[in-house]
Amino acid sequence: SAAVTIVEFYDYRCSPCIASHPELEQVRATEQDVRIVYGQLPIFGSHSVMAARAAIAAHLQGRFNAFHSALMTASAYPGMDSIYATAAEVGLDVEKLRADMRDPEVLQYLEEMRLLAEAA
């Protein structure tokens, strides 16, 4: 029911995406009439795809915002070890995350985000 919706397609290995994160977080925290919708668009290889799948899986556990923010503010681009470590740090069930990352619905959602980004 927000007056304005911002849709951000992002990749956890994208420098401009990472650079814009603090500003988007500021908007999310201070603007009541603005809604931010995040769409995964992994374009920088297999680690990007795995990080995107992990973010979707984190959403299934109700911890997307914490996981997303942790990856966006990390000191290095995420690899598999850091993805799982970050998941544990933000309180995710890592074994469930691993299973959900392989779920066909997660893979389908990721494909839908790609198609939506291409249409935008």
Which positions does each model-derived feature cover?
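Cysteine-centric redox/oxidoreductase cores and disulfide-bonded domains
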Residues: 42-120
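Extracytoplasmic thiol/disulfide redox context detector
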Residues: 1-47, 102, 106-120
